[in-house]
Amino acid sequence: MHYSQTSSFGGNHTEIAKIIHKFLQPRVKQYPLWNPPSREYMSRAMACQICEVTINEMDTLLICDACEKAYHLKCLQGNNMKGVPKSEWHCSRCVQAFNGKPFPPTYGRATRAVATTTAKMPFRAAGVLSSSAKKIGPMDIKANQQKPIVSTFSRLQNTGLVSGAATTSQFESASVNAKTTASAAKTTNIGSQGSKENVACGANSPAPVSLTETPNRTGIASTISVINNGLISKPLTPVGTMSSTSPLPVVNQLPVNATSNASPSTPITASLVAQAPTVTQNGDGSSTASGTADHSILNADITTQVHTLTVTSSSNSQQAVSHSEVAKATEDAAPLENVSECEKPSESTSHPDSLNDKTISENVQESSKDAKVDSEACQNHPTASPATVVPDQDSTITAAPSVTQEDSAFNTEKTPPQPLSVSSNYDSQTEKETPNVQDSVHNVPGDSEKGKGLNGLDDRHQEQPSEPEFYKSDSVKEENAA
């Protein structure tokens, strides 16, 4: 059996331990007053070390971390103790015993540390949360403050652009499909306010017509430009003052003074210049409405510009643009009685039915005779002034509102241009009836190379204001016809 071996091994172990303790030197105690931790104060009542009274209330108890003796808080406050210490507390005896040396670790410190940490953690966590909330709060406030700033800035920008766009200009566009071979250019000045109109027409092809109104404080020239595709044509405008007035009070008149540079042998197609009635407001609240329309055809003669309208139509042309606005503007005008007696719309205007039956030379002769009869009839009314003839000329031109651009288109393919044939009797009559033709012709600018423009006509009107306007225009036209 092996029991003897086990007993010998156990005895050897104890002997070895004893031998070791003999060789080991005992350590010097670092803390002579240090006692192992105990829990006696938890199981039994403790007396105060100052007043020696048993402490029954836990709220008034304070234990030293070194000697673990109890003290009353009231007794300690009497010994110049201000309050309960937050960290470890040692009594005066232990402090004097250690004399500045570090205190030994105590059992209660760990327990109290856990208690203090658990008690302080919510406070610290709350403090951290409050500080983070304080940090997040201002950030949110700043973000909330920045959002309105950004939105207001964007709004200010939008309103500024809109207001700027609204105050700078107003655009009105209208697309009209037009088929025409006519071309003309006309420039007029309208008082203190005007409008700029650009009209583009292509030959035998639809083209958009855009109207753009740009208000301006200063005067703006009203320009109507027509683009032609390859046809030989020149701008034609009557000599004199042409304007049509509406029932509204007219303040600013529209003078148009121009001459033609076309030669009699040059084939020139019918030209159409139309301007929609424009209404301008003055400072005193009054408004003016003016609309001008010129329908003129020149086949090597300019006598039919003012009083007659000879239009050669073709069956292949199509109606594209209507002149109802111009007709309404001129029909509403109220001509004076003296001028209405002088004018004869039936004689001055040729109907579309007779256009196909008459040749170009016959039309020119009849129109010149009608102009001569009108001038003789109008001479019997010396009281008529140039200003009174202005609306009547427009009413004569637009007496047939049914005449459209279809009638104004000239058929160059079917009717070739022919030179003008004027009889000698007509030349002798014009020379006898108009002795001042030579004087008036020199004042009219026939060629652009001579440098004589509209100023010559204006000076002629200023020198002889008493002479009627229609008489001068007839004399000029007869001279050009000769």
From Swiss-Prot:
PANTHER family: PHD-TYPE DOMAIN-CONTAINING PROTEIN, RING/FYVE/PHD ZINC FINGER SUPERFAMILY PROTEIN. This is PHD finger protein At3g20280. Pfam families: PHD. The lineage of its organism: Eukaryota, Viridiplantae, Streptophyta, Embryophyta, Tracheophyta. Residues 377-386, 393-428 have a biased composition (Polar residues). SUPFAM superfamilies: FYVE/PHD zinc finger. A zinc finger (PHD-type) spans 45-97. One of its GO terms (molecular function) is zinc ion binding. Transmembrane segments: none annotated. It comes from the Eukaryota. Keywords: Metal-binding, Zinc, Zinc-finger.
